Amino acid sequence: MRPLSFAYLNFVLILSLILSACGFELRNYANSLDNQTISLDANNSFLNLEMENQLNLKGYLNPSYDSQSTISIKILNHVVNRYVGSAGPGATTTQVRLDYKILYSLKINGARETQHTFEDISYIDFNQSDLLAFEREEEITKEDFIRKAIRNLEFVISANLNEIK
């Protein structure tokens, strides 16, 4: 073993020991919604069904508690708009901009209903010959939009719950 690699190994070992000793850990999203029951009111669009599916996977929705739910979410508008632009010689390279927007009303513990909006933008580059790959990429991007919207929703609900306390 060379002296340089031994010194590097010692450095990494000491650094990891220091970081673990001071309580450092990777980002962990708050689970302040674990003991809350959430009801979701939305139409049967693809985006709303995907959001409902992701909320179910996190364990936030429980259909048996609909009448007793402490948090009520009503999705008013949920859209992804697609804008296409071409650049380059012969316009062979195309870039698509996906604009995501969700408008929802939130009611916590029977308090006043408030409206919230979350917006996000993503750009996808693709070649005309890779149309199937682009469609899959667009689907993945929509799922990512919904994950970000749920994180934002968790933040808004947690902030409102802290204000109520």
Report each predicted region and the residues it spans:
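Surface-exposed short loop/turn segments
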Residues: 72-117, 123-139, 151
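Sec/Tat-exported extracytoplasmic proteins
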Residues: 55, 59, 106-110, 153-161
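N-terminal segment of the mature soluble domain
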Residues: 30-79
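Bacterial signal peptide processing site
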Residues: 23-25
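C-terminal motif of bacterial Sec signal peptides marking the signal peptidase cleavage site
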Residues: 18-21
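C-terminal/domain-edge helix-coil "capping" segments
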Residues: 132-165
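Bacterial N-terminal signal peptides that target proteins for export
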Residues: 1-11
